[in-house]
Amino acid sequence: MNSKCHCVKLNDGHFIPVLGFGTAMPSELPKSKAKEVTKIAIDAGFHHFDSAFVYNTEDHVGEAIREKIANGTTRREDIFYTSKLWCTSLHPELVRSSLECSLKKLQLDYVDLYLIHFPMALKPGDENFPVDEHGKLLFDTVDLCATWEAMEKCKDAGLAKSIGVSNFNRRQLEKILNKPGLKYKPVCNQVECHLYLNQMKLLDFCKTNGIILVAYGVLGTQRYNGWVDQNSPVLLNEPVLSSMAKKYNQTPALIALRHQLQRGIVVLNTSLKEERIKENMKLSPEDMKVLDDLNRNLRYIAGGIFEGHPNFPFLDEY
């Protein structure tokens, strides 16, 4: 399987490719690298690109997409582009202007999917991570239902084909789903999900409510300093994964990706080495169970800088 023709239907009728390419760049690389890897990814068969305002790569990603459209490699309607609303713009009056800012950087007319990046508001302003004189993040309070109504207006205006959320727990999803006058349900919830954090209960809840789970960090995340505990285990070194890779004559990464896809999850990948997942390769139910049992509720991106925020999502069971 590659991402060319494999999609799942969202609850608003649009389709999302099951395999996406992440465009966040490690801090040690220049942001301009995003243009290069996006062009390579398009050539490799990717159609689904995941980005965000806070990644500071949207101008480069947009340039890559436009160049590939201009030379006939792809068409805009064959690209599925996701952007995300950052925490400093959760006030409803800031939502549309933030999306328009992303569109201006991209030089595109619309995004295919627009997500609330985190359910935690930060003080609005020019800084993505505003802090006080002691270096502590400046939290803000916003009604997520009001933010969601502004997201719905972006969809109605044609600026986003679909709208969803990211890093929401069950309680926060329920708040949106139970909102009086809800016009559009979130089409997805993008969360960290991998063999060590399989999100079984959250996945079941999302499926029950027609919400697709989109997984980042499927291979254990890039080990960003400041965000990821450098002492945490390396997922791809898991012995069970290694032995299963030998059994199926695949790489450990492809086994990890296939496991999530067979669970009905849309997966984001940042490695161009793993862009092709053999269509005829399927894990047996017994092996799926073995991989399910590797769960240890280990969160690589624990969001520690947000701890203490009233909307911090990772204290609930799911």
Curated annotation (Swiss-Prot):
Q: Which InterPro entries match?
A: AKR, AKR1C, Aldo/ket_reductase_CS, NADP_OxRdtase_dom, NADP_OxRdtase_dom_sf
| Gene Ontology biological process terms in this record | cellular response to jasmonic acid stimulus; cellular response to prostaglandin D stimulus; daunorubicin metabolic process; digestion; doxorubicin metabolic process; epithelial cell differentiation; G protein-coupled receptor signaling pathway; positive regulation of cell population proliferation
| MF-aspect GO terms | 17-beta-hydroxysteroid dehydrogenase (NADP+) activity; 5-alpha-androstane-3-beta,17-beta-diol dehydrogenase (NADP+) activity; aldose reductase (NADPH) activity; androsterone dehydrogenase [NAD(P)+] activity; bile acid binding; carboxylic acid binding; ketosteroid monooxygenase activity; lithocholic acid binding
Q: What is its main location?
A: cytoplasm
The UniProt record lists the EC number as 1.1.1.-, 1.1.1.209
Q: List the residue(s) that the UniProt entry marks as the site Lowers pKa of active site Tyr.
A: K84
- Name the residues that bind substrate: K31, H117
Q: Name one GO cellular component term.
A: cytosol
Name the Gene3D superfamilies for this protein. NADP-dependent oxidoreductase domain
Q: Which reaction does it catalyse?
A: androsterone + NADP(+) = 5alpha-androstan-3,17-dione + NADPH + H(+); androsterone + NAD(+) = 5alpha-androstan-3,17-dione + NADH + H(+)
Location in the cell: Cytoplasm
Binding annotation for NADP(+): 20-24, 50, 166-167, 190, 216-224, 270-280
Keywords, alphabetical = Cytoplasm, Lipid metabolism, NADP, Oxidoreductase, Steroid metabolism
Annotated active site residues, numbered on this chain, are Y55 (proton donor)
Biological role stated in the UniProt entry:
NADP-dependent 17-alpha-hydroxysteroid dehydrogenase that converts 5-alpha-androstane-3,17-dione into androsterone. Has lower 3-alpha-hydroxysteroid dehydrogenase activity. Has broad substrate specificity and acts on various 17-alpha-hydroxysteroids, 17-ketosteroids, 3-alpha hydroxysteroids and 3-ketosteroids. Reduction of keto groups is strictly stereoselective. Reduction of 17-ketosteroids yields only 17-alpha-hydroxysteroids. Likewise, reduction of 3-ketosteroids yields only 3-alpha-hydroxysteroids.
Q: Cite the record's note on assembly.
A: Monomer.
**PANTHER family annotated for this entry?**
ALDO/KETO REDUCTASE
Similarity annotation: Belongs to the aldo/keto reductase family.
Protein name per UniProt = Aldo-keto reductase family 1 member C21
Q: Which gene encodes it?
A: Akr1c21
